[in-house]
Amino acid sequence: KDIATEFAGRGDEVHMYPLSFAEFMSVYKGDKYMGLSEYMLYGGIPLVVLRDGAGDKAAALQNLFSEIYLRDICKHNRVKNIGELEDLLNILSSAIGSLTNPEKLKNTFRTAKKSRITSNTIRKYLGYFEDSFLIESAQRYDIKGKAYIETPKKYYFSDLGLRNARINFRQFEQTHSMENVIYNELRM
């Protein structure tokens, strides 16, 4: 996202999303039910969609996540405690579509990990993930006034394949994954 500041006034920022489900199905050679399963597992990143075989797709996604997203986020933002950042990613990956906020996440860290991470640090990390287009937050629209400040949001991955790669393809919850797919379809 910062590239726009590097080249201020020299062009327009264009954000390319992964393939939508409809776009994915236009290149998928199979029935729509198998296509939906494949899309919910491996996502719509063209580099991955064009690969053959489950192992090759999984390896490409895991490499993309760790070597591109994670490394760039940590390097660009000078993250000192990479373990906490990764733990936050794991929490978000295993709870897509759940209402949460930095304060709740801080309490989770304190209870489960005996960590002293602050809600401000978590807020920064969430911003890093959003700036890298890894996740997006969905704000509630029925809130007014001061309640906006700490109202829980839902976090969705821009690509379910990246989410699944993060948790090593081990936690497949069809309802939450479908909610993420629907969010991504509506976002476009």
Place the predicted regions along the sequence by residue.
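Short regulatory helix/loop adjacent to the ATP-binding pocket of P-loop NTPases
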Residues: 1-13, 26-32
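Conserved catalytic cores of phosphodiester-cleaving nucleases, focusing on short active-site segments
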Residues: 1, 17, 182, 186
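Hydrophobic/aromatic beta-strand patches that form the interior of the parallel beta-sheet core
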Residues: 12-15, 156
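Acidic/polar active-site rim loop that often engages polyanionic ligands
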Residues: 5-9, 18-19, 41-44, 65-69
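Conserved AAA+ ATPase small/helical "lid" subdomain
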Residues: 33-66
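Gly/Ser/Thr-rich beta-alpha loop segments that engage phosphate groups in nucleotides
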Residues: 11, 45-46, 91, 99
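Accessory nucleic acid-recognition modules appended to NTPase machines
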Residues: 53-188
